[in-house]
Amino acid sequence: DTRSGDNQKLNIHIGSDSPEARPRLINVKDQITGIGISPKGKRALVEARGEIFTVPYEHGPIYNLTKSSGAHDKDPAWSPNGKKVAYLSDESGEYEIHIIDSKGKEKSVQLTDHENGYRHTLRWSPDGSKIAFTDQNLTLYFLDVASEKITPVDKAEYESVDVPIDEKPIYDFSWSPDSRYLAYSKMTEKQVFQIFIYSLEEDKARNVSQSLFYDFHPVFTRDGRHLLFVSNRTFNPTFGDFEWEMVYKDVAKIYSMTLQKDGKPFMPFRNDEATDNNENRQTDESQVKIDFEGISGRVEELPLPAGNYRYLSVNDQNLFYLNKEEGDFNRFEFREVPSMNLHAFNFESRSSHPVISSIHEYELSQDGSSIVYHQGESVGILPSSARESKGHSLDLSNLEMELEPRKEWQQIYQEAWRMERDYYYEPDMHGVDWDQMREKYAKLLPKATSREDVRYIIGELIGELNTSHTYVFGGDRKRRAESVNVGMLGADYTLDEKANRYRFEKILRHPAWARGVMAPLDRPGMNIREGEYLLAVNDESVTGEQNLYSYFQGLAGEQVRLLVNNEPTPEGAREITAEPLRSERSLRYINWVERNRQKVENLSDGKIGYIHFPDTYMGSATFFPKYFYSQLRKEGLIIDGRFNGGGLDPYIFLQRLNTKPLAYWTRRYSHDQTIPSTTVNAHMVCLTNKYAGSGGDMLPFEFRELGMGPVIGTRTWGGLVGVSQYIPLVDGGMLTAPDYRIYDQQGNWIIENEGVTPDIRVELNSLEMSNGKDAQLRKGIEMIREKLQNEPITWPGHKPFLEDPQAN
């Protein structure tokens, strides 16, 4: 009040229908996150949008077993007798094991009561008395269903980075046919995966691999006489075309381990007079017998070619396995769920055949008769005897649930809070009272009217950790702006106000080393020159009355006719055809790199080379070789890590740059060569700035640690914690929980929230940059030129072939 000086709080209320918060019936067939199958293969289990459904092979209704929009129900597993379904649910506030009747008529029963933690991967024992599972502590357990007693089996002390949380150890376990043993793999102190067999009666686990290789995905044969497993022990090197280096792919084969010391081999010698081998593979209901002494020596290789095998399962006739025939399972390849092909190896014929292609996952029924598979957005069931099947997709048109958004938003918020609690690398959450933070931001949830509001609240919550790589995104967002593509010609323009016409001020070209990036106006025969006028697009006259880009709406990727002239009039103009880009980002990037390269080349009389790293993953892996090999004989190199978006460890690039000559070869008719052949004998500097982060932080750090030269620029972003994978939320959103952090060789925490401080600080002036001036690049050139003047790069040469005898 301007007269009294009093302040009064205004109560503002904006009426809204809150359409995103309304309960509604939705189909979730495009949100499937897990599958399973009934014991006789008549129905599939489908996990979608946090609900558990059973779907008939052909006839009958779809049952929604859980009907819990406010809970995330997951990892369903059908009991061997077909009467119950086990699954995990966070209905209580933590993920607990529940069981429910297979038609959902009765209320579910919660079997566990944990205080906290994330659990995954449920598997029933064949006799139906126990359920094995794994938690975030990398511990394998089994639950006695009757007594509800939980027994720990084993704990993994090591893990690989960058694997999904549901594939963290110990997840590849399998039961013996008599339910008395569990086989699984875990990483040992040797940093290789080994197979262990745990005896429930002895409460003891034994390493049965005792090998030097990666052994994993074990499965018992149905007669209980052998253990089949995958092992990465086939090393057929692929050599690089440019240098002496080896890469090993397709390293996996499948092996059998005979469990009894007097047992028959899995692949005995064939003899027409011998008993039909198939008779020896019938299911044996008696107890499995294992002679652990010498078991690691009773291993044989199955007659299959090396590949990328995973996820074994068996019935009486076949071994089933997935193989990723294109690409690989390399943990350094960030991809979505891979597409794999299902094969079967027949025990009798000792040959394999394809079953179905391009699936994400599969499961074999308890009786071995049927297979459920997940392929794209479809789920299907086919007989296990199928060969090269096109599949049998189930009818998911009625895979529907009652969605109550506000209840789901509460679940999403609570799960995001729990995931940080359970997977954040520092158990004390950097001193943040995490319970208090949950309560603080939960008060905002009732005010949320959209999924975007929920994302914002979670972002504020995880922001309290003051840690990089904490992201939340995606989800069931309804309000999405429609985008209209705008074609881009790869040029800068100016408006000739007098003529009211646009002219080309700068035309972006593609340098020889980047022909894979298209420059629309730089194709042979176009001959468009800077300063010429753009008069028409598809016969529509282009004038300054409209924004230039309005003429290119909807034309990205389309062939367009351009009328061009060196005068602002149609007389004498020529028509050319071009294909505009959707984005000029890549084209402008390579032009910036090429300008820098040429500038360094010109200012150093060709003695200094230039290499830019846009990231520490595929971008650099693609561009690095294009200008690395051609600059091997430079006397200086500028390693530009500015604006580096990160990815993985950049050492793969730096080790090449840091390879020095150890000796030399001389030849009669050509110049001498270095040993190794690909070496760098040059003075180097590394440029960096505040826009370089994650792997972009690591690049200047490792460059300096390796003693490769000084770092120039400004302090980096300071984000060097890691995330193994994005954590899925119930509605398709994603969350990250940083689960590892860097420290140096003295045990000091480094870089995170600090960045890498350069040896020589040089600010980047944006105005100068826009005018083509780059103080950091200039400083790098100056330093290397000065270094070359004081310490010239020389080749030693060799002594004469025949020494002068009088020289002594």
Predicted segments, located by residue:
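PDZ/PDZ-like domain segments forming the peptide/carboxylate-binding groove
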Residues: V484-G544, Y740-R741
